[in-house]
Amino acid sequence: IWEVIEAAKTKPFGFQAFYPGPGIGGHCIPLDPFYLEHIAKKYDFDLSMIHAAGHINMRMPHYMYIKIATALNSHKKAVNGSSILFLGVAYKPDINDERESPALDIMDVTAHKSGDVSYHDPYIPEVKTSEGRTYISADLSAEVLANSDCVVLTTNHKDFDIDFISENSKLIVDLRNMVEEEGDNIF
């Protein structure tokens, strides 16, 4: 899909790129389509595509957890007891807003499966998830990366030095297509 987006971006006009990721977030996008669907039903208008999209978006944290578990399993590790560092909890890049961020739900699902969850976000020093877990942003150092069994790229902040992250991480699950290189340790 990333190659298709790059090819489409070569169109000289009339193209707006939309990028896949671990889910939707923010104060309006996760909710507004359901308001529209509700009003449409009053007028006997079928917007089943919005309903289907909403269902898919609600399942994304579990789907992303499966990607994390699969990556760990490929390295002979289980989620249970693994140290999993999430990079970015803001719902979009370069902001300090974690409202409805998909990263928080993925962290909850992973913690529920007994993963040792932590995060780093240069814009958000502390978060509380919908399940009530509170986390403080860890320092992003070579030691923290090396001690993590899995590093999950959840928000594509421009501040993230991808080369530094790649060089110091055992395993990376890239949910934002930030790592350009390929390897056995990049999913």
Language-model regions, residue ranges each:
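Structural/interface elements that position substrates and couple domains in central-metabolism enzymes
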Residues: I1-F187
